[in-house]
């Protein structure tokens, strides 16, 4: 199978490395797939070609010799996707609309890895690009700009570094098209990646987006040293918020007990490699949002989509007090201790409400 990964950030590079390193059978040296990693940044592409490593986004990981590296003005997006069997979009949500518009005539499956909602410019620090609309998940953007595209999402609990190293990881391939799900299983299911299929693309997308916001809250909780009891309560009640929003948007409740819901939430909220968790930890230390984001050097999608999640929930009448507290913190309207007091001071209710 010929596979092109668009976007050479940490996750795109990791998936390309893992897939390029897969072989036909145990004991064989024959590559299972022909994999291309494409990026717009000319300097990044040249550096990867020269060093056979992505030291900017995934340092310490060697790029396999059979991984093709393209882009940077030498190879256009159209040229990169031509003749491929599967197109993977490993870019931030902010790039999804433009890419899907460019690929709307693609005759092969197009699958994204990004987790989040489009966000208004005012909610995004550091001068994010203007967007045509906001509040949409990628499958909703696709419905607007590329209705005939056979598309899906690959999601679940997955730190890029562990995927690149070939450590065991389980993911969900979600699409309303069975052929897209089958293509993802054929492409990635192997010795280190286990792929589960789902047709609940709404649930898988909501889980992947909302967990980033909740991970900021959990990082804050741990940074304030509120204890393991508080962390467990926050994750559990956060899962309830995620499920309420997802079901209201048309997802199945059981999806949120799976890899793309509970699994991804636990990993992102507690794992030390989590960017969103790091934002919460730094806010707890008294750093400003701008300082926290700048120190990451990478995108933390929870910062970019938190307000959109809350706005979407409010428009649907969905109660999300933890997510609301995160937005108030990011906006500087609440201090960490005040956010904790506000959450603990809410009136009693039943657990499943």
From Swiss-Prot:
This protein's major location comes to cytoplasm
Q: Which residues bind sn-glycerol 3-phosphate?
A: 115, 156, 158, 211, 264, 274-276
Q: Which InterPro entries does the record match to this protein?
A: 6-PGluconate_DH-like_C_sf, 6PGD_dom2, G3P_DH_NAD-dep, G3P_DH_NAD-dep_C, G3P_DH_NAD-dep_N, NAD(P)-bd_dom_sf
Supply the PROSITE patterns for this chain: NAD_G3PDH
Q: Which residues of this UniProt protein bind NADPH? A: 11, 40, 115, 160, 275, 299, 301
Catalytic activity annotation: sn-glycerol 3-phosphate + NAD(+) = dihydroxyacetone phosphate + NADH + H(+); sn-glycerol 3-phosphate + NADP(+) = dihydroxyacetone phosphate + NADPH + H(+)
Top-level EC class as recorded in UniProt: oxidoreductase
Q: Give the family per the record.
A: Belongs to the NAD-dependent glycerol-3-phosphate dehydrogenase family.
The protein's name in its UniProt record: Glycerol-3-phosphate dehydrogenase [NAD(P)+]
What lineage does the source organism belong to? Bacteria, Pseudomonadati, Pseudomonadota, Betaproteobacteria, Burkholderiales
- Gene encoding this chain? gpsA
